[in-house]
A protein has these predicted regions:
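Histidine-centered active-site microenvironments of extracellular/periplasmic hydrolases
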Residues: 6-14, 124-129, 138, 155, ...
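Detector for Asparagine
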Residues: 69, 76-77, 119, 152, ...
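N-terminal start-of-chain detector that recognizes signal peptides
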Residues: 86-87, 148-150, 181-188
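A long, amphipathic alpha-helix that forms part
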Residues: 91, 95-107, 131-173, 190
Length: 198
């Protein structure tokens, strides 16, 4: 949503009848202890005071690649259904897709507006294990996680489009796909070269 976390900015106060998601800027894709994903989090200093990359158990990786600490995305920013916090254990991109497909199922008999705001491929970098395996050939871990997140989102958008097709709504639906970021700096996996800016 990212339009503000205070009650006056909640989607219900801006014309929406249903809401599933989070209201602040970002969110972890799975809750701690981050089971089923490879997680890379930014840290100013690694355990032991070193720089570079530190690999822990269960796919948790700390990196000084940005020179700052990853914000606590989930603090005071729960996943909510309607106005009530819910515990979501499914990878967030998949959970948002599940809810979108369910929404289409429940509203396929009348016009609707579905605003689906994925947080992928925004940080934190958390790639689902199944997608990480698909990109095992990518040596650079940052890029591998990014590719896993992007492929997951691509499949998820495909699932929403397939539901529209299955429901007979494909030819009577306007679809807008927007991204709030260009390619991030090299530290976050990509480059826009030979173009300038990000």
């Amino acid at each position: 949503w990212h339009q503000g976390g205070q009650a006056k900015y909640h989607p219900f106060r801006h014309g929406f009848d249903e809401f599933f998601g989070f209201t602040h800027e970002g969110h972890y894709f799975v809750p701690p202890p981050y089971k089923g994903v490879t997680t890379m989090l930014r840290r100013k200093t690694l355990p032991g005071g070193s720089k570079g990359r530190w690999v822990g158990d269960r796919g948790l990786i700390y990196s000084t690649h940005m020179g700052s600490n990853e914000p606590d995305y989930d603090a005071n920013n729960p996943i909510v259904r309607g106005g009530q916090p819910v515990v979501e254990h499914e990878y967030l991109t998949d959970a948002l897709t599940r809810e979108a497909v369910d929404f289409i199922d429940r509203h396929d008999d009348k016009p609707f507006l579905l605003y689906l705001a994925y947080n992928a491929v925004h940080s934190p970098l958390q790639g689902a294990d199944a997608y990480m395996k698909k990109f095992a050939h990518i040596d650079d871990l940052h890029r591998r996680i990014f590719a896993a997140m992007l492929a997951n989102m691509d499949d998820s958008v495909g699932a929403v489009l397939a539901k529209l097709r299955e429901s007979g709504l494909e030819d009577n639906t306007l679809i807008f796909f927007l991204s709030d970021n260009g390619g991030p700096t090299r530290e976050l996996t990509s480059s826009n070269l030979p173009l300038r800016g990000s």
